[in-house]
Amino acid sequence: MKNINPTQTSAWQALQKHYDEMKDVTIAELFANDSDRFAKFSATFDDLMLVDFSKNRITEETLAKLQDLAKETDLAGAIKSMFSGEKINRTEDRAVLHVALRNRSNTPIIVDGKDVMPEVNAVLEKMKTFSQAIISGQWKGYTGKAITDVVNIGIGGSDLGPFMVTEALRPYKNHLTMHFVSNVDGTHIAEVLKKVNPETTLFLVASKTFTTQETMTNAHSARDWFLKSAGDEKHVAKHFAALSTNAKAVGEFGIDTANMFEFWDWVGGRYSLWSAIGLSIILSVGFDNFVELLSGAHAMDKHFSTTPAEKNLPILLALIGIWYNNFFGAETEAILPYDQYMHRFAAYFQQGNMESNGKYVDRNGNAVDYQTGPIIWGEPGTNGQHAFYQLIHQGTKMVPCDFIAPAITHNPLSDHHQKLLSNFFAQTEALAFGKSREVVEQEYRDQGKDPAQLEHVVPFKVFEGNRPTNSILLREITPFSLGALIALYEHKIFTQGAILNIFTFDQWGVELGKQLANRILPELGDDKAISSHDSSTNGLINRYKAWRA
């Protein structure tokens, strides 16, 4: 990968001038001037996904200039570097190969002179065998009963991805009940343990190093709870498995290392659901559906790595995001899935995007003077409409939104889905075109009211519109289409990081807080007043000690 400051390119300068021409152009004008706008600014993927980006403040010239930026920053070279196994995570000297985990073509992918695919396939096969034993009931707990509940203990990528996918694919789930514990707050593990039976529960401890503070604290609490019933430590092996690479620590915990599922340092945590970290997904929906998830992602990988940039969906969405973030000053993006099963999708890509591209230092080690990662947030529709859409429609912030919905629902109750989708379509239309003063006044006249007498209310009912959105319509949310959708967003994030000259695959920002917490923890062990920090931190710690006494 080349280290090119995007603001120093001629394409960036051209975009700055173009922004001056575009800043007052409205989406309504763009549609009025081009009857073929939807056809020009939308694309389908495998007849499974329609991406409509026509309701954006862009023209063909805008996209051409953004594509020039991608060329000048050598995006094509960056894509080749990632897929070829080059160590593009330079601060940790690691390759970035989540694409290898779903490489259904089995084409060799070389890291340090070694094809990684045989090991990837071996772990997949091991997960298949293990999961089939659990799901079939062949695997027995310490009293001879089959497993009924699975508790995944992890945090960050070891929790968010599997939790999001098992929820999104709930229509495909089997008889096993899944639980996820992440927070070191004891309430989280305590509430889950109230729901499960030690005789029929399997715990998955997801920590690459088997040293993650939150995960291991919860794992030891789960082990202690289990042993209160099981008694003999030899029974731990029948109820705990590890997603880790630290065989020594796994064995010391009491887990049979035959039930340790490894992954590699070229798998980043927030890109790890495709790896052994996805074992909870397999246990929830079955191995065949997990393979479909991998296959959908692999199909998007092929699209991303082979499709010309002008028709490449992750690249197009990434470029539009850069346009708003760096030229319009939009600091945020909302992800709004109109599907209740997808209720964790925004939270998943909140981590995926903000931990990846929330960087202020470029690949040369210099502070940037432009915008990098946006703030990502969102909730399912239509809940959000009754919560925060007010600000999106009439607030002072520009909030570009991604609306996501399936054409076919898994629960065709009455006319629920038509009502849901009517809102999905209506919101993007309302955000784009708004409602003028003239329309508001005409509505009053149609109701037999005199607009002049209601003059004081009219301004509050006007919608400026011109609020940008993308619409992603899936045929149906299946393991395959979900895999493709996740990979679409992953590659969008990678594209933005590559163009913005930052390292997308490290996360040093999480380290300082950990270090300070490790320093503070021993100070909380007694009731002595603390004076070793700033006055605020000292005051907080000392009040905590006073109140807990």
Swiss-Prot record:
Residues of the active site: E355, H386, K514
Keyword annotations: Cytoplasm, Gluconeogenesis, Glycolysis, Isomerase
InterPro entries linked: G6P_Isomerase (IPR001672), G6P_Isomerase_C (IPR023096), Phosphoglucose_isomerase_CS (IPR018189), SIS_dom_sf (IPR046348), SIS_PGI_1 (IPR035476), SIS_PGI_2 (IPR035482)
TM spans (from-to): none
EC number of this enzyme: 5.3.1.9
Reactions accelerated catalytically: alpha-D-glucose 6-phosphate = beta-D-fructose 6-phosphate
Subcellular compartments: Cytoplasm
Pathway(s) this gene product operates in, as recorded in its UniProt entry: Carbohydrate biosynthesis; gluconeogenesis; Carbohydrate degradation; glycolysis; D-glyceraldehyde 3-phosphate and glycerone phosphate from D-glucose: step 2/4
EC top class named in words: isomerase
Main location: cytoplasm
CC terms in the record's Gene Ontology section: cytosol
Molecular function terms, GO-annotated: carbohydrate derivative binding; glucose-6-phosphate isomerase activity; monosaccharide binding
UniProt GO BP: gluconeogenesis; glucose 6-phosphate metabolic process; glycolytic process
Keyword Ligase in record: no
Pfam families in UniProt: PGI
PANTHER family: GLUCOSE-6-PHOSPHATE ISOMERASE
NCBIfam families: PRK00179.1
Task of the protein: Catalyzes the reversible isomerization of glucose-6-phosphate to fructose-6-phosphate.
Family: Belongs to the GPI family.
Protein name according to UniProt: Glucose-6-phosphate isomerase
Organism of this sequence: Salmonella schwarzengrund (strain CVM19633)
